[in-house]
């Protein structure tokens, strides 16, 4: 696995060590390099058809140097040594000392826990296997409730490959798959129009697209429609709020988190 990442980023163990020496040359206390190759594919369904497909690729490396609590950071979208050395020198400017020490820690690959059942490739995120899945969910929602007037579906799949090395000699590689399916339905009854969104995300590839997951999405939206249409505005004043796991944590952060950040900084 380690050799695969060296080939992907076109860099060697010896070059990583050289970059750490370059980053610490001005007297930094600590330095690390973070290389990332990420691909993302997004399909959007509107009016019963998948009419938008987007593919993104992000590639590059960031180098960080820390000196007395100050941080210098620089990045490059190329892993050519000329550009990486320039990034290391730029990040090193945070250190004011001129007497840096060369890296002495041995190169030590870390054995990290494997959280995924397989090693993913581009084939595990093949675009056309998702088009039929999105259209099937759309059709089931349309047939399930005649109050639905519009449906928007989206799938997003990404795979990130990470390579990390620091001035302590610690080295590791990681692969991070992430796949999401989101459906929003707009429905109307007796002059009242509202909407409901269901989203599912897993650290998986295309094996996420199962009949069971489709059932969950369809059933959740169809069961929510009468509840949402019957909902009314609450009275003003204090009231108990029940928050579910997941996305509602963002609401909690926005409500009180920023105030705490201001206090603690």
Where do the language-model regions lie?
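Active-site bordering "gate/hinge" segments
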Residues: 1-265
């Amino acid at each position: 696995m380690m050799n695969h990442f060296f080939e992907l980023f076109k860099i060697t163990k010896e070059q990583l060590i050289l970059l750490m020496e370059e980053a610490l040359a001005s007297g930094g206390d600590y330095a690390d390099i973070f290389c990332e190759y990420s691909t993302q594919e997004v399909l959007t369904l509107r009016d019963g058809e998948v009419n938008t497909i987007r593919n993104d690729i992000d590639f590059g490396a960031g180098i960080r140097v820390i000196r007395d609590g100050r941080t210098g950071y620089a990045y490059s979208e190329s892993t050519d040594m000329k550009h990486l050395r320039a990034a290391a020198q730029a990040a090193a400017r945070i250190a004011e000392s001129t007497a840096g020490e060369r890296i002495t820690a041995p190169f030590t690959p870390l054995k990290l826990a494997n959280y995924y059942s397989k090693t993913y490739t581009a084939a595990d995120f093949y675009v056309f296997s998702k088009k039929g899945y999105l259209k099937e969910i759309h059709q089931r929602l349309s047939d399930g409730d005649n109050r639905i007037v519009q449906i928007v579906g989206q799938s997003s799949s990404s795979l990130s490959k990470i390579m990390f090395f620091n001035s302590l000699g610690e080295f590791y590689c990681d692969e991070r798959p992430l796949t999401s399916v989101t459906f929003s339905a707009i429905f109307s009854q007796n002059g009242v129009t509202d909407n409901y969104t269901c989203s599912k995300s897993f650290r998986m590839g295309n094996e996420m697209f199962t009949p069971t997951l489709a059932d969950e999405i369809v059933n959740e939206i169809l069961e929510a429609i009468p509840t949402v249409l019957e909902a009314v505005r609450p009275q003003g004043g204090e009231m108990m709020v029940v928050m579910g796991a997941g996305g509602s944590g963002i609401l909690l952060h926005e409500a009180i988190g920023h105030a705490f950040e201001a206090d603690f900084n």
